[in-house]
Amino acid sequence: MGSGGVIHCRCAKCFCYPTKRRIKRRPRNLTILSLPEDVLFHILKWLSVGDILAVRAVHSHLKYLVDNHASVWASASFQELWPSPQNLKLFERAAEKGNFEAAVKLGIAYLYNEGLSVSDEACAEVNGLKASRFFSMAERLNTGSEPFIWLFIRPPWSVSGSCCKAVVHDSLRAECQLQRSHKASILHCLGRVLNLFEDEEKRKQARSLLEESSRQGCLISSYLLWESDRKVDMSDPGRCLHSFRKLRDYAAKGCWEAQLALAKACAGGSQLGLEGKACSESVCQLFQASQAVNKQQIFSVQKGLSDTMRYILIDWLVEVATMKDFTSLCLHLTVECVDRYLRRRLVPRYKLQLLGIACMVICTRFISKEILTIREAVWLTDNTYKYEDLVRVMGEIISALEGKIRIPTVVDYKEVLLTLVPVAPRTQHLCSFLCELTLLHTSLSIYAPARLASAALLLARLMHGQTQPWTTHLWDLTGFSYSDLVPCVLSLHKKCFHDDAPKDYRQVSLTAVKQRFEDKCYEEISREEVLSYADLCSTIGVKQESPEPPSFPSSGEIHTFLSSPSGRRSKRKRENSLQEDRGSFVTTPTAELSNQEETLLGSLLDWSLECCSGYEGDQESEGEKEGDVTAPSRLLDVTVVYLNPEEHCCQESSDEEAWPEDKIHPAPGTQAPPASAPRPLLCNRGDRAKDITTSGYSSVSSSSPISSLDGGMGGSPQSTSVLSVGSHSSTKPCHHQAKKSCLQCRPPNSPESGVHQQPVKRQNLSVHSDKDMHLAS
């Protein structure tokens, strides 16, 4: 009953239920923390260690994930970061959690005493034990490639005092005696090291180590034992057949060296009881498994790199390989390492030469008996870089390539073809010449290495007028028909012979490969007249297309960014030169001086090269780099702009240009070299700009570091680009019409002023030190 005695019913008209208030749900805020942990791990993986520490500080849950899951540290990136006292704990933690890059860099840092200075008197022993620990970790984590740590501790070892390499070797050997698992690769490395000694006792120990490694499943150790026994096994038919079966087993398991040896062994297939068809199928499988890797991807990663700049770098590496008499395989592996690194990591332009020479140091140690030492490599760059720069970039390279150095190359397939097919010596040299030229052009990388090698052999036989350049036997061996190879042959001819080679800023053509094959050991094959493109098309039976335009920019667009290898040596051919024969130019450090100067300089050069080349100079494990090179007084910006020589004060021009134009008179007591003689190839480091007409390259620094010897080093070498006799440290502006830009100008230090540049202890000027301190805080 309501008010006033009125009775209300509960119908919808008289009675209303209170309406329900609908509460709006707040939208759920989704953040990165809302993701499943598996997804978070994928996000955290491959971040740099600095980013991981920054993420760790954001939230307690992220902190928990970073601190309690090893996979985050195992995949953390330490790119461009080197071990130092400030970040040592981060490196050690990552290495213990399974980070390959951290383990490699720690091992190299302790071995070369770079970045982690030890003030203990027994520096070699302390560092050697620590390096051994992290090298062992790195080898244990290296599951996809051959054992590699032996290349860092291979001889020569120091004969005076303690040697860090020897300490690492002994420590690893002791570890193998105690540890029962994961030691096959370590045993292989120990065996490889001892096998390089001349001592017969050490070689016996090396064989026993390799046998133990083979029993524990190391495939490459098994192949090395097979190779050492091959000569003995081939003398007996029964043992020969058993040896061949073992080789076939190793090849089937994926050993690349065994696959190559098996393919070459098919040349004597009848002796092994194999039918011709079975041999052809075995070789064909090898060739058809070859895959192309498009090197044009380099330029999508390296935005500041051009094809011409890469051409200049590879040309310089060819010149170094020629000077040091390295094999074509070593050169090809070096270039492959450079290209693989460029596809994976950014490289500033001023570090290209450092990358190239570091790859050569690694490859020579991995496959050659004669090595390129770190000191000599620094010298070859005209001391543009320092000892520690090269040591650190070696760690970056091994980390980026994940320890995989040996990969299939064009040379491998070429050697197989030349073993299986009878080819005239000059045709073999021409085929090798063509294979070497393929290194210079990234556009040819669209073809697999096996196809390139086959096309090189076909083109060589065509150029030498073979009536049957590609037989059915070659078709069966490679799986490539004549028509399959025609496009590759045409591209090869265009790039190697039709397109002009790029020129440096001095209008000098970069032809190091051509000069390499002008040697008599190659029967001067590069001097041979080349079959024209029209005649080639006519011989092949295809319609001639308009040749592609040269892909290289004009000389005005080419900037210098490399230093001449050791030296200011040049066999380049200047197109506008009046000299028709420049073949007399040599690639070894020589100079056209007076008799007295030649005697003094020759003695100094002999001493320097004796100390710093080959095995005798690689005493890098004693901390000998300390005090080796002084820090440069200043650095030149690598962005080089071409300047009008009439408007800019440059230093003296090269001897080729200055003598005929300026009529420079020799200093009293010296003999002026004739105009047709090679220019001096050794000069004062402080006066390096006087010789900027090197073999197509110029140093990036305005003044080279001054070398000094550590007092306790004894016979450790100085850089061989030392003060030449009769040179003056003062420089004067040139007043002639120079044909090049002035890239290196430094204030004169007159000898009469009595002011001498004092060597200072090398300091670490790396840019990552601030970051290290930040990460450790």
UniProtKB/Swiss-Prot annotation:
Compositionally biased region (Basic and acidic residues): 768-777
The short sequence motif called Nuclear localization signal 1 sits at 20-28
The entry summarizes the disruption phenotype as follows: Death by 10.5 dpc, with many developmental anomalies due in part to failures in yolk sac and chorioallantoic placentation. Heterozygous mice are normal and fertile.
Give the residue interval(s) assigned to the motif Nuclear localization signal 2: 568-574
In terms of superkingdom, the source organism counts as Eukaryota
- Which stretches does the entry tag as region PEST? 582-761
Gene3D superfamilies, per this entry?
Answer: Cyclin-like, Tetratricopeptide repeat domain
Renumbered to this chain, motif D box 3 spans 349-352
* UniProt cross-references to InterPro entries, sorted A to Z: Cyclin, Cyclin-like_dom, Cyclin-like_sf, Cyclin_C-dom, Cyclin_N, Cyclins_cyclin-box, F-box-like_dom_sf, F-box_dom
Q: Where is the composition biased (Polar residues)?
A: 751-767
Q: Where is there biased composition of kind Low complexity?
A: 695-708, 719-731
Intervals of motif D box 1: 310-313
Q: Which GO terms describe its molecular function?
A: anaphase-promoting complex binding
What's the entry's take on its domains?
A: The nuclear localization signals mediate the localization to the nucleus and are required for CCNB1 localization to the nucleus. The D box motifs 1-4 (amino acid sequence RxxL) are involved in substrate binding, such as FZR1/CDH1, and may be ubiquitinated.
| UniProt-recorded name of the protein | Cyclin-F
